[in-house]
Amino acid sequence: MGPGGRQSAEPASTEVFGDSDFVVVANRLPVDQERLPDGTIAWKRSPGGLVTALEPLLRRRRGAWVGWAGVVENDVDVQDEPIVQDELQLQPVRLSADDVAQYYEGFSNATLWPLYHDVIVRPIYHREWWDRYVDVNRRFAEATARAAARGGTVWVQDYQLQLVPKMLRAMRPDLTIGFFLHIPFPPVELFMQLPWRTEIIQGLLGADLVGFHLPGGAQNFLILSRRLVGADTSRGTVGVRSRFGEVILGSRTIRVGAFPISIDSGALDQTARDRNIRRRSREIRAELGNPRKILLGVDRLDYTKGIDVRLKAFSELLAEGRVKRDDTVLVQLATPSRERVESYQTLRNDIERQVGHINGEYAEVGHPVVHYLHRPVPRNELIAFFVASDVMLVTPLRDGMNLVAKEYVACRSDLGGALVLSEFTGAAAELRHAYLVNPHDLEGVKDGIEEALNQTEEAGRRRMRSMRRQVLAHDVDRWARSFLDALADSRPNDSADAAD
């Protein structure tokens, strides 16, 4: 029984089996639906490291991907037939306008997202949002149960679908189920604020393996499993891709581990070496007036990313004369995000006001000191910006990993550039030769930026070489293999016979 006397309905077990031995479950399909001028529907592949890493396995193991196609539907009870796109089987889950408003924009991104990111913005708790979250998670679980072959493996992705493992286990006890959280898992005292805290932990414990970016998230989950569910758990520290924690729940043992996600670093390294990318990077510098130094920020426009922190630090460095306005520029690329959520609308207004103030104070006519783009940037153009810039600014207040930091490093085969990186990113645990800063300490951020701008060539090359060694050795393929190997080892001996 949940808060307020509510009960989470248990899905009924199903005897229906699909034909996919491996199923990925995520909020979005790796394709976007497009309606052509003649009214027909086409599917456009959306880029992403996850599908790149999992595609070979999906092909090899008769895989399927369950997710939302990004289009609002009126009748969510219709079960769409699987889509075959580039030989991948995709199983759409329909969402209505109310689903998007309450499950996605509401509970996922106005309740869970701020709660899991250290309550930078106050989470909103609405019973209606929770009820919709339960309902949509059930639909994802049902679609997965229909797609998965007998004794198959299912990998559920991220915070939008934390109830799916338990629901799916009730429907299909024969399956081996893994779950990975792509955002930070909060400290115990913050998670305890959630009215539906027990239901979330119970939902995750439906998996055989629960994965986080960092050991700290795994440790928090073990504590909450003891406190909220009364489970027995291991007490030792959790390692990275090793020394897994365990939760004992009745006859089941759930493994808990840390698996830092990464990027397709080899492919990115090769693309950044392309002569056209190199030429474009030189053009970018020329278009910016050939400044001595270019600072770069690349983020979704999100309040967790610390865009305001780097802008304020840059403004004060200009005011103090520690950075010269006639030879240094800051480029901020901000991808639009969750534009219907009020806190994101407020953030955009604040950032644009900040940019205007800095340029009004320090720019010359036709020569802004901050170049701000609020729109998506094509992939190759983004890579050219990485190659062109001298200092990459990654200053989130909280971030599960931050792949932009790793992408920048992967693009710098010339060993040029410098990375200023927030201590509160998962990437900071791996990229120890970045200029690590506390985004809550403005003076420290300013010092980090100044050090990066003024580093010697030898010191910069030494730092970048070390970071590249880490990023190229630990790519997204290694991340996926390490998780799936651990999941295979977590498979109960009797799982294949559990449905008999």
UniProtKB/Swiss-Prot annotation:
It catalyses: ADP-alpha-D-glucose + D-glucose 6-phosphate = alpha,alpha-trehalose 6-phosphate + ADP + H(+); CDP-alpha-D-glucose + D-glucose 6-phosphate = alpha,alpha-trehalose 6-phosphate + CDP + H(+); GDP-alpha-D-glucose + D-glucose 6-phosphate = alpha,alpha-trehalose 6-phosphate + GDP + H(+); TDP-alpha-D-glucose + D-glucose 6-phosphate = 5-methyl-UDP + alpha,alpha-trehalose 6-phosphate + H(+). GO terms for cellular component: cytosol. GO terms for molecular function: alpha,alpha-trehalose-phosphate synthase (GDP-forming) activity; alpha,alpha-trehalose-phosphate synthase (UDP-forming) activity; trehalose-phosphatase activity. Pathway: Glycan biosynthesis; trehalose biosynthesis. Its EC number is 2.4.1.15, 2.4.1.347. UDP-alpha-D-glucose binds at residues 48-49, 300, 305, 403-407. One of its GO terms (biological process) is trehalose biosynthetic process. Keywords: Glycosyltransferase, Transferase. It comes from the Bacteria. The record marks 113, 183 as: Involved in alpha anomer selectivity. D-glucose 6-phosphate binds at residues 28, 104, 158, 338. It is an enzyme of class 2 (transferase). It holds the Pfam family Glyco_transf_20. The keyword Electron transport does not apply. Homotetramer. Probably involved in the osmoprotection via the biosynthesis of trehalose and in the production of glycogen and alpha-glucan via the TreS-Pep2 branch involved in the biosynthesis of maltose-1-phosphate (M1P). Catalyzes the transfer of glucose from UDP-glucose (UDP-Glc) to D-glucose 6-phosphate (Glc-6-P) to form trehalose-6-phosphate. Probably also able to use ADP-Glc, CDP-Glc, GDP-Glc and TDP-Glc as glucosyl donors. Belongs to the glycosyltransferase 20 family. This is Trehalose-6-phosphate synthase. It comes from Mycobacterium marinum (strain ATCC BAA-535 / M).
